[in-house]
Amino acid sequence: HAHKECLQLLICVSGKIMVTCDNGFGVVNHMLEEMGNGLLVPAGIWTKQEYQTDGAVLMVLCDRGYEEEDYIRDYEEFKKFVAL
């Protein structure tokens, strides 16, 4: 999914997690490992998380509260959003 306005900080608390980031024009993979690093994800980026180890835990910090209308859950809708 992606967000229209929300900024997120993804931190791997335990294990390993592959985060795929797609801006609609290209894709980049980031491996997050046990508190070693975090990933700042701006609005308008489609992300997918793949848990690489059993028991992996991802902590997500956001700059705003939950707002369902901020979510883009359909990839085709996301491509239209980034084309604007």
Where are these regions (language model features)?
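Short, conserved beta-strand element in jelly-roll/cupin
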Residues: 4-19
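Short, surface-exposed beta-edge/turn micro-motifs
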Residues: 6-9, 36, 55-56
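A secondary-structure boundary/capping signal
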Residues: 13, 41-42, 62
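Flexible, glycine-rich phosphate/dinucleotide-binding loops
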Residues: 18, 26, 67
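Short beta-strand His + acidic residue motifs that chelate non-heme Fe in jelly-roll/DSBH
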Residues: 19-20, 39, 47-52
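Short acidic-glycine-tyrosine-enriched beta hairpin
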Residues: 23-43
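Double-stranded beta-helix
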Residues: 48-84
